Structure formats: C-alpha cells, structure tokens
Amino acid sequence: MTIPYTPGRLDGKVALVTGSGRGIGAAIAIQLGRLGAKVVVNYANSAEHAEKVVAEIKAHGSDAVAFKADMRRVAETAKLFDDAVAHFGHLDIAVSNSGVVSFGHLKDVTEEEFDRVFSLNTRGQFFVAREAYRVLSEGGRIILTSSNTSKDFSVPRHSVYSGSKGAIDSFVRILSKDCGDKKITVNGVAPGGTVTDMFHAVSHHYIPNGEKFTAEERQQMAAHASPLHRNGFPEDIANVVGFLVSKEGEWVNGKVITLDGGAA
C-alpha cells in the first residue's frame, strides 16, 4: 500500500547541510530531519556539537550522520558530497550554511582578513553549489546563505562581510539558470539578526555605542527593530528552508529571501 504524500514532508529525501553543528545550520538540519529527510551534518571543528545534532535528528525518527570537512578546501567539499552519496545512496538537498563574520574599517582591512572571509563565505559556497549540482538527483534543491547586510541593511565597518554575501545574491540568480537542466532549484536565505552564540559575540557592532549595553539589552534592542517586536531565532530560518526544499517550494527559484521580521 502506497503511503499518501503529506504536503511539506521530505520522506525519502537526503539532505546535506554544511556548518550544521550549531546555530542556524543545526536548526536547519534538525528541521529537515523532522520533516522526514535523512541528514548529513557537516562540521569543521567540533564533532561533539555535530553528534548532538545527529542524536536529535535520530530522536525525531529520521537518520543522520556527521562528516568533518572544511568548506574552504574544495577537495574536502567534493569528498563530503561523495561520502554523503556513498552513505545514503543518493542526495536530494544541499544547504550551504558555513560562514564567518568580519568587522573592520576600510583602512584597517588586511589582505589576510579579506581572503579569510571570502574564501569561505563566497568561494566556499560557490564550490558547494558546484559539487551539489554534480551529485544531486534530478529535481533537487540547493540553498545558499546570504545576509540582510548584502543589500537591505548597511552597517559601518562591515564591508568585507557584506560584500562576501552580496556575491551570493548573484550566484543564486545565475546558478538557478545553470541548474535548470537537472530541474534543480537554487535559492538563498538572507537572515537578519538571529539569536545564536555568534549574535551575542558581535551584536555590539550593529548598534551605535553598542559596547555600552549588556548582551541582554542589545538583544531587546534588536527585537524592537522588527515591527513584530521579537527576535529572530534559528528555527525561523529553518522553517523557510524547509519550505524551499519541499515539493511545494519548487516554483520559487533564483530568489534570495530576506528573513529579518521586517526590520530592514
């Protein structure tokens, strides 16, 4: 007896999420698992965090595995995708989430800092998309991660990071054309301020004289930037990704969706 399809479900699908040991990436991996997908959890540093995500996905009734790979290294990216297919038999969804943040006035930015940011946020994501195209099943999904600072929200001393994410907007638009021959959609999400450990570490940069306020005060100020008067959380991003990679999300293609609760 064939089980009827439930809208929004990802049963039978396999997803890979880069940088999914914590924060937004972890929330995305867990959400895709809840929707029924088997998930490859990728991490670059902490196996402990990644294994916790794997355990949570399994607790919800799906399957998951953690693989270490640095998205700055294209050979490791390619091997990660090969390992994902070898482990689960196929791959349907690739979510590129790995990234680093950077702040600095133009006069102080070094070549090393520029390369550190662009090698992961921009170059790394491009080659994740390339490897995803290579192995994804027909009708697959690719999601890249931009930022609301790429075009909607201007922050002083944030040019390198914002520029690294602005390139993603162009990648999404053009790669959606390249991937059409395999019926693969390519979209992006552009989170605004989202409460994670990274948020608390850098939130003072986004608020004038932010160092004068406590982390809790800065979080409250960020909440009031949205007309909904609440903060964004990783689950808010994960819910949108869950839709974009579903059957129902197919007609959204080549688009970057800003997720900031209307703050920008």
UniProtKB/Swiss-Prot annotation:
One Pfam family hit: adh_short_C2
The EC number(s) this enzyme carries: 1.3.1.-
Pathway of action: Secondary metabolite biosynthesis
Role: Short chain dehydrogenase/reductase; part of the gene cluster that mediates the biosynthesis of the tetrahydroxanthone dimer neosartorin, which exhibits antibacterial activity. The two different monomeric units appear to be synthesized by the same set of enzymes, among which the Baeyer-Villiger monooxygenase nsrF is the key enzyme for the divergence of the biosynthetic routes. The pathway begins with the synthesis of atrochrysone thioester by the polyketide synthase nsrB.
Catalytic residues (UniProt): S146, S147, Y161, K165
Annotated family: Belongs to the short-chain dehydrogenases/reductases (SDR) family.
GO BP field: secondary metabolite biosynthetic process
Record Gene3D superfamilies: NAD(P)-binding Rossmann-like Domain
Keywords, in A-Z order: NADP, Oxidoreductase
GO molecular function: oxidoreductase activity, acting on CH-OH group of donors
Lineage: Eukaryota, Fungi, Dikarya, Ascomycota, Pezizomycotina
Protein encoded by which gene: nsrJ
Statement: the UniProt record of this protein carries the keyword Electron transport: no
Family matches, as PANTHER family: NADPH-DEPENDENT ALDEHYDE REDUCTASE-LIKE PROTEIN, CHLOROPLASTIC-RELATED, RE15974P
UniProt xrefs under InterPro entries: NAD(P)-bd_dom_sf, Sc_DH/Rdtase_CS, SDR_fam
Record-given protein name: Short chain dehydrogenase/reductase nsrJ
Listed PROSITE patterns: ADH_SHORT
Binding site for NADP(+): I24, D70, N97, R130, Y161, K165, T196
Leading EC class: oxidoreductase
